[in-house]
Curated annotation (Swiss-Prot):
Protein name: 19 kDa globulin
Record organism: Oryza sativa subsp. japonica (Rice)
SMART domains: AAI (SM00499)
Phylogenetic classification of the source organism: Eukaryota, Viridiplantae, Streptophyta, Embryophyta, Tracheophyta
Alphabetized InterPro entries for the sequence: Bifun_inhib/LTP/seed_sf (IPR036312), Bifunc_inhib/LTP/seed_store (IPR016140), Glutenin (IPR001419)
Keyword check for Signal: yes
Amino acid sequence: MASKVVFFAAALMAAMVAISGAQLSESEMRFRDRQCQREVQDSPLDACRQVLDRQLTGRERFQPMFRRPGALGLRMQCCQQLQDVSRECRCAAIRRMVRSYEESMPMPLEQGWSSSSSEYYGGEGSSSEQGYYGEGSSEEGYYGEQQQQPGMTRVRLTRARQYAAQLPSMCRVEPQQCSIFAAGQY
């Protein structure tokens, strides 16, 4: 009987140690998350965002490296900005940069609906009145503002995420790849 009590007490003590260790890990994780959040806010990765934009808009792909004005310097700045962010927070910083880039992209007027309100402007080419989507060139949106073709935004967002996921590899920093599709991260 005494051995059962000793065994039970030892098991209870081990469980308490495990629980306190888990609580410590949880509080350490919260601290690290807050620290990362601050670090990510302080490091917007502006040069990386410009590299991403140049890559996606084609301003960088069709010129030889030596003819790209500032492209090499911009990549070096991007790599330096990535190195300035701690290893643990790099992927979160890249995710935030991509999210910021996505939020700045104009949304297409798909199927004639305005992305900012519930007003209907007519489908692509459905009206000859001025100001409708599809009037003139396929790049003009309502009242002539620049818009992307329907579906192009989704493709561009996917490419942005794929390219951004490879930035650490391009800069030779750890981790070599980041999951840009992770939700709920800064």
